[in-house]
Amino acid sequence: MVQKPHSFRRKTRKKLRKHPRRRGLPPLTRFLQEFEVGQKVHIVIEPSYHKGMPDPRFHGRTGTVVGKRGDAYIVEVPDGNKVKTLFIHPVHLRPQK
């Protein structure tokens, strides 16, 4: 029997797909975004940039910025009855309006 893969990007065939016209890296402003502590952010994974990428199960979730570590932001995301702490690069974050 063959075992199914337990890799980081499994079951993400459609979730991490980019439109052909949007291929390549995003604009520099997405890399240089700044967020305040306490600000709400949406986690939207950028599949072309792998550093600081959160687990795909957090794609589309909303969290709160708690701090900064290096280039990444520390984001707390509610997951059921727990609060998960994630270290996410700003290219994978969008501010909540």
From Swiss-Prot:
Record's keyword terms, sorted: Ribonucleoprotein, Ribosomal protein
GO BP term, example: translation
Keyword Secreted: no
Transmembrane segments: none
Region entry Disordered, spans: 1-25
Biased composition (Basic residues): 1-24
An annotated Gene Ontology molecular function: structural constituent of ribosome
InterPro entries on file: Ribosomal_eL21, Ribosomal_eL21_arc, Ribosomal_eL21_CS, Ribosomal_eL21_sf, Translation_prot_SH3-like_sf
GO cellular component: ribonucleoprotein complex; ribosome
Keyword Transferase: no
NCBIfam families: PRK04306.1
Similarity-based family: Belongs to the eukaryotic ribosomal protein eL21 family.
Protein name: Large ribosomal subunit protein eL21
Species name: Pyrococcus horikoshii (strain ATCC 700860 / DSM 12428 / JCM 9974 / NBRC 100139 / OT-3)
